[in-house]
A protein has these predicted regions:
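Acidic, low-complexity, intrinsically disordered interaction modules
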Residues: 45-47, 53-82, 129-156
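Alpha-helix capping and inter-helical loop/turn segments
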Residues: 40, 95-99, 112-114, 128-129, ...
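Amphipathic alpha-helical elements of HEAT/ARM-like alpha-solenoid repeat scaffolds that form extended
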Residues: 27, 65, 86-88, 137-141, ...
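Short terminal alpha-helical segments
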Residues: 2-47, 68, 84, 88-92, ...
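Amphipathic alpha-helical binding modules
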Residues: 140, 144-187
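Intrinsically disordered, low-complexity linker/tail regions enriched in Pro/Ser/Thr
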Residues: 74, 78-116
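Short, charge/polar-rich alpha-helical segments
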Residues: 120-132
Length: 188
């Protein structure tokens, strides 16, 4: 498997270029190949955990299962930590982190009525989000690591496929009309 920490450091050393929005978004979407490599390496422990958590109906029990798994397994996963670091580097290197992400995420939560749902980020990732919505949700997840590091929101979103679904939305909306809309609302 690739050393994702090393790749992240290599990306950070690339001289800044004046790339178009489309080129920058395509650089972000390339991250999906690294996700696939990581997912293909899942051991039986990971797969059985995902199945178990999907089947759990009791929200409190689900929360405990997730927390224990994050603490005992994911926090020690060097490759997942590397993916997290790599994605953060890509977001900042290519200036794809949305400054007003909270505003857009709150509008999204209202739009899809997910305010009180515990796994609202995962639910939103399964929607057909436009570029601004998808980048805002991705930025929200990345920034949430700062105030809730113990619960590993960004790493867990990478692990459980939420980030991949967001990137799929981005990939599906890289076109002239969506990019023009993004340029209007995002300050560089």
């Amino acid at each position: 498997m690739n050393d994702f920490h090393k790749i992240a450091n290599e990306i950070a050393r690339i001289p800044d270029e004046n790339l178009s929005w489309e080129e920058r978004l395509n650089e972000l979407v390339k991250f999906r190949a690294y996700l696939k490599e990581y997912y293909d390496s899942y051991g039986e422990d990971y797969l059985s955990f995902l199945e178990r958590i999907e089947k759990e109906d009791d929200l409190e029990e689900k929360y405990i299962l997730e927390y224990d798994f994050k603490k005992e397994v994911l926090s020690k996963d060097y490759n997942l930590d590397g993916l997290n670091y790599l994605l953060v580097n890509i977001l900042f290197k290519y200036k794809l982190a949305i400054e007003d992400y909270n505003e857009y995420v709150n509008l999204l939560k209202e739009k899809y009525d997910v305010e009180l749902k515990a796994d609202w980020e995962k639910i939103l990732s399964e929607k057909d989000l436009d570029l601004l919505e998808a980048l805002s949700l991705l930025t929200f997840l990345q920034r949430s690591d700062y105030w809730d590091y113990e619960h590993m929101p960004f790493s867990y979103a990478i692990f459980d496929g939420t980030v991949d679904k967001i990137l799929e939305s981005i990939e599906n909306h890289i076109d002239e009309e969506n990019i023009e809309f993004l340029e209007i609302f995002v300050k560089e």
